[in-house]
Amino acid sequence: IFFTKIKHAAICIGQIKTPKPREETYKKLKAAGFNLPTFFAKSAYVSKNAKIDEGTIILNKCVVNSNTKIGKCCIINTSSVIEHDVNIKSFCHISTSVTINGSCTIGEKSFVGSGSVLRESIRLKNKSFIKMKSSIKKSNIK
């Protein structure tokens, strides 16, 4: 479907209502044999102990601390802080200036709006939608 000598591709599709276009594009690119590298902005800090899966983009001034796992094709947007031992599943969009405190789990295909703060150990179910400037003190999954 593309040039035969190109082996890498990047997906630059955001998310507010649904990650479906990004997920479908990912599946098509993988089926065509493409690798999807992970991108880190020069001003981002990513711990050497963090595990970041393919196709994820970590933008300017983000912090990703130790033992954090971020799944496939996620967007960690400008100035967000992802603390220790956080698990962000695939196809999530963490908007600008979000703080996710330690040991939280963000379910697959979730959206966390700008300026939101999640207390430590929060668990969000798949396809969660968190409005901007939310203060999350309780999990929405047991």
Where is each model-derived feature located?
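Phosphate-bearing ligand-interacting subdomains
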Residues: 1-41, 45
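Structural signal for interior beta-strand "rungs" in well-ordered beta-sheet cores
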Residues: 38-142
